[in-house]
Amino acid sequence: MGLTFTKLFSRLFAKKEMRILMVGLDAAGKTTILYKLKLGEIVTTIPTIGFNVETVEYKNISFTVWDVGGQDKIRPLWRHYFQNTQGLIFVVDSNDRERVVEARDELHRMLNEDELRDAVLLVFANKQDLPNAMNAAEITDKLGLHSLRQRHWYIQSTCATSGEGLYEGLDWLSNNIASKA
């Protein structure tokens, strides 16, 4: 009886670990998001060549977040990070109307990869503080998210510099990855 209770207790209260891959076009705000979540503050960033990886502790979950550079020359390297990814965060600059089609193409190219077939998708519609930013509904449309019938996805409006929307996104990820486990 005691052993059964111990197993149940540890299953309920043990820290869960989740591997998250965060990608998106260059200058979308990925690194700013990563360090806002990790440190709770805004850090000065430079374009990411390669990757940053940090562990973010939130609600008894340890998120290992891989932030991979988004410049067009290094996007082919994204595929090297796909294996064992449980959640995919795709960050979009909501103010960048000129490149939203490029963002859509990169997203759909990635989602066609077999190694990501089981990963849930969270889209961060970032930079919502800017006056010309597209709202989440417009980005949903422009990214063609409704066509993703076989994929569990969610879009969250965010502002990396204030932190608005970031933890709501982590809540969705934790609930939806946990339900698939």
Curated annotation (Swiss-Prot):
Record keywords, A-Z: ER-Golgi transport, Golgi apparatus, GTP-binding, Hydrolase, Lipoprotein, Myristate, Nucleotide-binding, Protein transport, Transport
Keyword Lipoprotein recorded: yes
Any one Gene Ontology molecular-function term assigned to this protein's record: GTPase activity
Lipid-binding residues (covalent, N-myristoyl glycine): 2
CDD domains: Arf1_5_like (cd04150)
GO cellular component: cytoplasm; Golgi apparatus
The keyword Cell inner membrane is assigned to this record: no
Tissue-wise expression: Seedling shoots.
EC number(s) reported in the record: 3.6.5.2
Subcellular location: Golgi apparatus
Residues annotated for GTP binding in this entry: 24-31, 67-71, 126-129
Main subcellular location: Golgi
GO biological process, one term: intracellular protein transport
Pfam family of the protein (one): Arf
SMART domains: ARF, RAB, SAR
Catalytic activity: GTP + H2O = GDP + phosphate + H(+)
PROSITE patterns: ARF
Top-rank lineage group of the source organism: Eukaryota
Family classification: Belongs to the small GTPase superfamily. Arf family.
Functional note: GTP-binding protein involved in protein trafficking; may modulate vesicle budding and uncoating within the Golgi apparatus.
NCBIfam families (UniProt xref): small_GTP
Protein name from the UniProt record: ADP-ribosylation factor 1
